[in-house]
């Protein structure tokens, strides 16, 4: 028996190793097994059974004795016991190159086995029955490895059988035709023997087909019906993938509603990979137009689901859903309604490029691929007469209808792969813009011409840069040789075309700012060498003349900056046209500078009210100079002095037009930045550095003056520039080997920091209704609100950058942090990122800033409600909630934030006991309620740190305080409670139950610390702050240093203390133990000595006090917070969320024949009853039912 067992092991190992290594001799191995089967069925089948067991990762071996005398269920139970419970890996899930090929080889083995057996032993009613019975039993196992491997084997076995059934069907049809042909012959020519042979062959084929159908029914009913809704997504995906193959391979038998319903139901699966398999399976069906008639009912029932899947949370699923709809569209134009198509159209503007590209292909198939046969004769025509002319117009109409006029680049990129020829037909677009319309042709409207120019610019950019627009894609990639050649050809073609036509286009649309702005960007993508090689210098001269005319005509900032960038693109020293362009640019700036100085001199000499015409002339000239200074170094024109005079006069007189001040500030900013850039690149003399330093500081003073201007635009411009200048000239300026610029380092004084912070508080943290920039129309009003919010976010980000880079004091961030909850929707991401960055710089200082922000809010509440506020009030609850959110930002690693959390508690305790009650010691300190807020951070303390903080808290408490049980002392009791809880206990404060967020009873017991503090004599007189630490702890709590109270520009004290009270950092001691004010370390030593003397009495009294606290706390409900909208401060928890809501698949059977075909063969007697494992709820909703899917591994 042992020898036989060993022989089986060797044979089995050979099969498994062949499959694992993926050898090409798979057919010969199968043939050898077939020969072994013909010689000894049981031995060969035992080898095959052990092969499946080993492929499942099981170390057990089925012996001959087990095979002969045990039922399948008993064998599987025995094999389950042989599993290695310490590892959940098995061949189908193992990592490594050899296992990646295993699945393919495993599936190939099963397919080859059936193919080689299809004319012989497959019909012996033993081999296939045994294999199917085994796989059915294994697929019903609670062991995932058995279930996964056997389901894959069964599904591949079914696929192979479907192929056999298809061949049998074809042979039957051929035999039937031969029989009919022979029978229809004349009696004299008819061969009766042949008729008998054909009848016998048809009968054999029919019997074989019946046998194969029985096998398929057994697999389908025994495996598929139960496993397509398995708890494991991979198993469900296998089932759906294979049923798609069956329907495509043998559509006559499987492509009907009885099988399609499983795919339709599973499109609601909660896992994206399963939904993806549904879509790919359907794509294979819809691709074959001959099958469309069989899909009509399915399409009508599940079309809405497919359309909704274009918005799937998994982008891969959304892409395949769009591709499937494209195939549906090609099969029939009438299936998809206009609303269905519109749901796909808008996805061309998606930021996810694969989704957008798929939507672009759908759009192209729907709107652009239908060509009139009459156009075949004009295919070679170009320009306005080309067949693309109407398609270009259609594209323009679609772009305008979508009402997303700022996203033409996204539209072009979406269609770039499928409509390249159309989008690169620049001759057609150029002709539509320049040429007159033909007879009977309707001319483009002004709005359509603007859209066409914008699309034209985007196509030129896409062809020249060869990468998606900003916000779509991962960035630039290395181009292939073919792509580089295409890029060069495109740049050559567009340069040859637009170098000639661009001056004409600019002349035609010179008065239209929007059109001109887009057209002026075209030269940025030119191959400038063609101006010389193509002898196009005269067209360059025409272009420069048009640009000069546009500069003289327009004062719009966008137009002027486009002109400036065009000069910058053309002024490339690598090309021979540089001198010509540079001369034209210099002449233009000379005229502008002279005109500005002349106008400025006259303008500043006007003593009476400023003349509007003169002001307009000054403003228009200043706007032109500022636009050019943005892209060009105009230092040699000495623009600083003129702008300085203008700004200084505006400060002195106070009546300077706002736009003049705004552009003068911007122009002066450019002057300073260009000077700094030149010094950084080429170096500078000491005198030049001194001059720049003086100019920079004078300019900062001017900006600081304008922060208090009455005009909002001026204040915002001054603030933005100030933040930029302070950032640029901070200590960072010397980084990277620029030590020579150290004299330029400028740090803002406290007054400037206060003004910057005040600006943020007054202009950023405001309600939308307070912003006076809204318009009259509802749509314009909404757009203006969004624009105003975007502007305020930029202002806040500029100031937060100063905090992050330590340009301003970190404690100024307290006024920002305290707005976190109130303005979470508008600025939550900015404030949270600022917290994160400041914590990286200095954890302790960041923690002190957070507690300072809570103290400020607490003081503001006291000012508004006095000290008799209700701790269940919304204001106090909001502060507690903010504290909880702050605590969440510290993360889960308590060791990293240990020192910061300890310092936070120290500052909080000092603040709570800072103000003694004027009614005497029988009443709590005025800020005692702050301990309720501080308790939100207790869960972030380590166990030993809780004991240390508790000891520090006791220093501020009198003996009578520990005995107080009135409600006004609840914050102290709650805070002590949180410190005495276990190290891992996330105990919340007692009063949290009044905050309205729901409550739950905690069962954790509160234990007082049992360790006694004992200090060596040598340390009793030490001045180290660590004397207050518990020496029995294995880890030392961070030192709590005495620090001054942080203040801020708007922090208001509710009450001014007497000098002697404000000096004392702790609550007054008992009268009999009263001591003069001591330093921090002396107090620690004194307190420890007093505790050693009174230890016995205090322990007894504290036991009584703690027993009361425990009793009271057990009667209170600790809050278990409900997860809210903004719980993302914690580590994200990834969940599998069902795409469709429950009940969406109701009445799916209505109108469809969903009766599964009957099984002719009875279930195998070796198969375990399924009711023992789980109920057989054959309902589409059972896919979403966790009770049905809840199959554990063991």
From Swiss-Prot:
Record domain SCD: where: 224-309
Region named Disordered: 986-1027
InterPro entries tied to this protein: ARM-type_fold, Cohesin_Scc3/SA, HEAT_SCC3-SA, SCD, STAG
GO annotations of cellular component type: chromatin; chromosome, centromeric region; cohesin complex; nucleus
Extent of Low complexity compositional bias: 988-1001
Family to which the UniProt record says this protein belongs: Belongs to the SCC3 family.
Complex formation: Part of the cohesin complex which is composed of a heterodimer between a SMC1 protein (SMC1A or SMC1B) and SMC3, which are attached via their hinge domain, and RAD21 which link them at their heads, and one STAG protein (STAG1, STAG2 or STAG3). In cohesin complexes, STAG2 is mutually exclusive with STAG1 and STAG3. Interacts directly with RAD21 in cohesin complex.
Protein name per its UniProtKB record: Cohesin subunit SA-2
Organism: Xenopus laevis
Lineage, broadest ranks: Eukaryota, Metazoa, Chordata, Craniata, Vertebrata
Gene: stag2
């Amino acid at each position: 028996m042992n020898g036989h067992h060993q022989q089986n092991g060797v044979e089995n190992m050979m099969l498994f190793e062949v499959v694992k290594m993926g050898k090409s001799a798979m057919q010969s191995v199968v043939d050898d097994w077939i020969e072994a089967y013909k010689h000894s069925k049981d031995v060969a089948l035992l080898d095959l059974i052990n092969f499946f067991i080993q492929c499942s990762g099981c170390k057990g071996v089925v012996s001959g004795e087990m095979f002969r005398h045990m039922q399948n269920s008993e064998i599987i139970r025995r094999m389950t016991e042989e599993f290695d419970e310490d590892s959940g890996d098995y061949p189908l899930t193992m990592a490594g190159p050899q296992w990646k090929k295993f699945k393919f080889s495993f599936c190939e083995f099963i397919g080859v086995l059936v193919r080689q057996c299809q004319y012989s032993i497959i019909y012996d009613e033993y081999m296939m029955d045994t294999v199917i019975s085994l796989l059915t039993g294994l697929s019903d196992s609670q062991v995932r490895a058995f279930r996964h491997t056997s389901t894959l084997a069964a599904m591949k076995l079914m696929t192979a059988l479907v192929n056999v059934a298809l061949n049998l069907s074809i042979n039957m049809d051929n035999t039937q035709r031969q029989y009919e042909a022979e029978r229809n012959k004349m009696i004299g020519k008819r061969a009766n023997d042949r008729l008998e042979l054909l009848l016998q062959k048809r009968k054999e084929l029919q019997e074989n087909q019946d046998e194969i159908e029985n096998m398929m029914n057994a697999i389908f009913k025994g495996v598929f019906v139960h496993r397509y809704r398995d708890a494991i997504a991979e198993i469900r995906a296998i089932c759906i993938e294979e049923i798609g193959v069956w329907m495509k391979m043998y559509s006559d038998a499987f492509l009907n509603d009885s099988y399609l319903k499983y795919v339709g139901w599973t499109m609601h699966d909660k896992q994206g990979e399963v939904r993806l398999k549904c879509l790919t399976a359907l794509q294979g069906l819809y691709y074959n137009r001959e099958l469309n008639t069989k899909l009509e009912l399915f399409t009508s029932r599940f079309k809405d689901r497919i359309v909704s899947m274009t918005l799937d949370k998994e982008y891969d699923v959304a892409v395949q859903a769009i591709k499937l709809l494209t195939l549906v569209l090609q099969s029939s134009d009438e299936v998809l309604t206009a609303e269905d198509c519109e749901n796909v159209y808008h996805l061309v503007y998606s930021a996810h490029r694969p989704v957008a590209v798929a939507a672009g292909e759908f759009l192209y198939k729907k709107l652009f691929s239908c060509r009139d046969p009459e156009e075949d004769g004009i295919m070679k025509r170009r320009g306005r007469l080309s067949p693309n002319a109407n398609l270009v117009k259609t594209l323009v109409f679609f772009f305008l209808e979508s009402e997303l006029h700022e996203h033409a680049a996204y539209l072009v990129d979406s269609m770039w792969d499928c409509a390249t020829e159309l989008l690169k037909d620049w001759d057609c677009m150029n002709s539509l813009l320049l040429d007159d319309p033909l007879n009977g042709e309707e001319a483009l409207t002004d709005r359509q011409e603007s859209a066409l120019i914008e699309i034209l610019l985007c196509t030129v950019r896409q062809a020249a840069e060869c990468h998606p627009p900003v916000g779509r894609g991962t960035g630039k990639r290395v181009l292939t040789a073919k792509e580089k050649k295409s890029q060069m050809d495109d740049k050559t073609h567009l340069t040859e075309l637009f170098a000639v036509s661009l001056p004409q286009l600019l002349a035609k649309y010179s008065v239209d700012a929007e059109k001109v702005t887009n057209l002026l960007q075209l030269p940025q993508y030119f191959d400038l060498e063609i101006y010389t090689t193509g002898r196009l210098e005269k067209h360059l001269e025409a272009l420069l003349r048009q640009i000069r005319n546009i500069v003289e005509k327009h004062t719009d900032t966008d137009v002027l900056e486009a002109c400036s960038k065009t000069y910058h693109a053309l002024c490339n020293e690598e090309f021979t046209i540089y001198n010509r362009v540079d001369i034209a640019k210099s002449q233009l700036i000379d005229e502008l500078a002279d005109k500005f100085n002349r106008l400025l001199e006259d303008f500043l000499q006007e003593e009476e009210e400023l003349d509007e015409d003169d002001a307009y002339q000054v403003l228009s000239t200043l706007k032109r100079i500022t636009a050019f200074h943005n892209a060009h170094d105009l230092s040699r024109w000495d623009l600083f002095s003129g702008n300085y005079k203008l700004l200084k006069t505006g400060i002195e007189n106070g009546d300077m037009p706002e736009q003049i001040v705004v552009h003068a500030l911007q122009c002066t900013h450019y002057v300073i930045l260009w000077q700094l850039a030149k010094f950084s690149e080429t170096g500078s003399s000491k005198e030049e550095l001194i001059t720049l330093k003086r100019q920079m500081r004078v300019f900062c003073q001017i900006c600081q003056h304008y922060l208090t201007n009455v005009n909002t635009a001026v204040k915002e411009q001054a603030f933005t520039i100030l933040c930029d200048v302070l950032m640029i000239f901070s200590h960072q300026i010397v980084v990277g080997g620029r030590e020579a610029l150290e004299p330029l380092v400028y740090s803002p004084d406290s007054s400037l920091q206060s003004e910057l912070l005040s600006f943020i508080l007054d202009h950023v943290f405001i309600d939308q209704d307070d912003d006076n920039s809204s318009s009259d129309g509802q749509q314009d009003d909404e757009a203006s609100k969004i624009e105003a919010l975007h502007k305020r976010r930029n202002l806040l980000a500029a100031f937060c950058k100063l905090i992050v880079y330590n340009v301003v004091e970190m404690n100024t961030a307290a006024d920002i942090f305290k707005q976190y909850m109130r303005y979470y929707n508008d600025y939550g991401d900015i404030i949270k990122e600022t917290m994160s960055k400041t914590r990286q710089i200095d954890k302790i200082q960041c923690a002190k800033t957070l507690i300072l922000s809570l103290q400020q809010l607490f003081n503001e509440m006291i000012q508004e409600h006095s000290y008799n506020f209700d701790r269940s009030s919304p204001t106090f609850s909001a502060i507690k909630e903010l504290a909880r959110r702050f605590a969440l930002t510290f993360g889960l690693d308590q060791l990293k934030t240990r020192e910061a959390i300890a310092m936070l508690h120290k500052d909080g305790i000092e603040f709570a006991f800072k103000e003694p009650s004027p009614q005497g010691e029988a009443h709590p300190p005025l800020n005692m309620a702050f301990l309720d807020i501080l308790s939100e951070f207790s869960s972030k303390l380590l166990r030993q740190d809780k004991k240390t903080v508790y000891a520090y808290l006791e220093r501020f408490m009198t003996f009578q305080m520990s005995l107080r049980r009135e409600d006004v002392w609840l914050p102290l009791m709650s805070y002590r409670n949180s410190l005495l809880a276990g190290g891992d206990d996330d105990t919340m404060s007692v009063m949290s139950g009044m905050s309205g967020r729901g409550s739950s009873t905690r069962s954790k017991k509160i234990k007082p610390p049992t360790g006694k503090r004992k200090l060596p004599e040598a340390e009793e007189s030490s001045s180290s702050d660590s004397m207050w630490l518990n020496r029995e702890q294995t880890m030392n709590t961070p030192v709590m240093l005495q620090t001054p109270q942080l203040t801020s520009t708007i922090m208001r004290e509710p009450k001014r203390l007497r000098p002697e009270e404000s000096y004392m950092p702790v609550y007054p001691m008992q009268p009999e133990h009263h001591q003069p004010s001591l330093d921090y370390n002396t107090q620690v030593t004194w307190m420890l000595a007093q505790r050693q003397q009174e230890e016995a009495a205090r322990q007894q009294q504290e036991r009584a006090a703690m027993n009361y606290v425990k009793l009271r706390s057990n009667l209170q409900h600790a809050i278990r917070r409900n997860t809210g909208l903004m719980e993302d401060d914690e580590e994200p928890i990834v969940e599998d969320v069902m795409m469709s809501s429950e009940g969406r698949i109701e009445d799916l059977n209505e109108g469809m024949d969903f009766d599964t075909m009957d099984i002719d063969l009875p279930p195998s007697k070796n198969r375990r009853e399924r009711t023992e494992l789980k109920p057989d709820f054959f309902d589409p909703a059972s896919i979403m039912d966790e009770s049905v899917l809840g199959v554990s591994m063991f």
